[in-house]
Amino acid sequence: GKGFAVRIGFEDCTTEFIGFIDADLDLHPEGLAIALDLLKSSGPQVGGAIGSKVHPKSNVEYPLSRRVLSSVYKKFVKIGFSLDLNDTQTGLKVFRSEAIDKVLPTLKCNGFEFDLELLCKLARNGFLFIEIPVDLDYKFKSTVNIRTGIKALVSTFWLAIYLRRN
């Protein structure tokens, strides 16, 4: 899954900063450069710059069904996790490698909930985040549907339990 693939990439990284963007081409890749520039100009306590569909300057075009699923998931995350973020799931993120190195050995999630686990564990280690606007243009059929949305909610529920116990 996504989480497994990103973790493998993180393990092989030797640069000062590391990032990823979803491969479905919905997000403009220029967002990576913007995130990197903002992260470079911030203090070391800022562990990552993450894309946010709900940022006031974001330009987001995608179907109502995806908006509904995204809204439900965001509300679920707000209730279950104590993260001061408006959007954890947009697939554009850049991090300081030193921040990733602190949490990488503890990451367990292999699916879509990986982003949330990563952000929670970074926050627990004292890192802050910058949310950045994104340009999102839904072009292709996604693998996300009602079934995967329900699976994501269930996985996220179990992640909340796991993080509370550990």
Regions found by a protein language model. Give the residues of each.
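Acidic metal-phosphate-binding loop of nucleotide-sugar-dependent transferases
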Residues: 25-27
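Catalytic donor-sugar/metal-binding loop of nucleotide-sugar-dependent glycosyltransferases
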Residues: 84, 110, 119-135
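C-terminal catalytic/acceptor-binding lobe
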Residues: 126-166
